[in-house]
Amino acid sequence: MGNVIGIVAEYNPFHNGHARLIEQTRAQLGAVCPVVCVMSGDFVQRGSPAVYSKFARAEAAVRCGADLVLELPLPWSLSSAEGFARGAVGLLGSLGVVTHLSFGSECGELDPLQRVAEALLDPLLGEDLRAELRSGIPFAAARQQAVARRVGALAELLQAPNNILAVEYLKAIYDQRLELHPLTVLRTGAQHDRFAEGNIRSASELRMRIGAGEDVSAFLPRAAAEIFAREKTRGRGPVLPEALESALLSRLRMLPQTVYNALPGATEGLGNSLYRAAHEEPTLDGVLAAAKSKRYALARIRRMTMCAALGVTTSMDGGTPPYARVLAIGAQGRELLRAIDMRASVPVITKPAAGRSLPGPAGEIFALTADAHDLYVLGCPAREERRCGGDWRASPFVL
């Protein structure tokens, strides 16, 4: 098999910018290059439910150019940018067929991103980071200052969200010594506000518009727009954070303090702060505001909250995913799967029942990810779509 493109994504929702990344990457490597995507499941890295289910988003991806969509298991979907990238890139590497990793960035150039990634991997960076943190500035600012000591103004790249992920992807490639060739495509028209021009908007703006009841189909590929319209008609979406508030609060209030202290990111008393907030505040926003500290971003607290509710602990998101679950198969997906089956270093799951026989931690993580779907569907607008156990019954979508 020749070149195979790997892409890490959330597709929350799949939009024109995502289709453009696939198109631009194929323009560089060849129009018939197969594309395999590792995609977050029902909960995403910002610590929120996805607006549409993983099954709908995976179907949209293969109808819009991808050939195979694999699920990033829950512990890595709800991890920091570093953990998210490590898990997703590691999963692509474990397939044994992916030759290139393509990602969008505000920078659009590989060399500056590589220099920042190398600076972050400097063993002495931790000492400089701790020195910056002692001055009382937030973690992100302290990290940027520590990197600036090594690469100067290039550290400013860490102020843009897609640059941050791009750097983490590169770190994952270097740290795991993977034979993946990185490619980056300039993000266009994807500013994180309402004033972007053209037919591309950022996913964050589209989620905001969807939450407000607006029609966003002009910014989605036609096939994706049709899929999400179908999901809305059937009452399976959109799933908005407020729809899960009562379920999340009830879960958070039932957990002992020991669970909070075992959460990913529960350092410097954050676990204790979140435990107190969960037992004092009447709303989820109140919990987040009460637990937030000056040093850490709100997204970190949201992830901790979701990890607590879903049973993710700090022992789960180390390393890389121990299996590859197939969510959707596109035009070249069958051929790609045959090659992966011969070369992958992890089990490839096409039928969810096979997840029950995964040994040890792999089976536990598969079951945890399936349980998360049961919480997710409680946010579906239609009551009949809130049935339990759906993740165990779902087969991959086949184009």
Regions found by a protein language model. Give the residues of each.
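Generic structural signal for well-ordered secondary structure
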Residues: A50-K54, V62, A81, A85
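N-terminal catalytic cores of NTP/NDP-binding nucleotidyl/phosphoryl-transfer enzymes
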Residues: M1-R57
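Active-site cores that bind ATP or allylic diphosphates and position pyrophosphate for catalysis
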Residues: E71-L399
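Short, contiguous strand/loop micro-motifs
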Residues: A9, V44-Q45, A61, P75-W76, ...
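N-terminal cationic-hydrophobic initiation segments that often serve targeting/anchoring roles
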Residues: R26-G30, V62, L92-G93, Y174
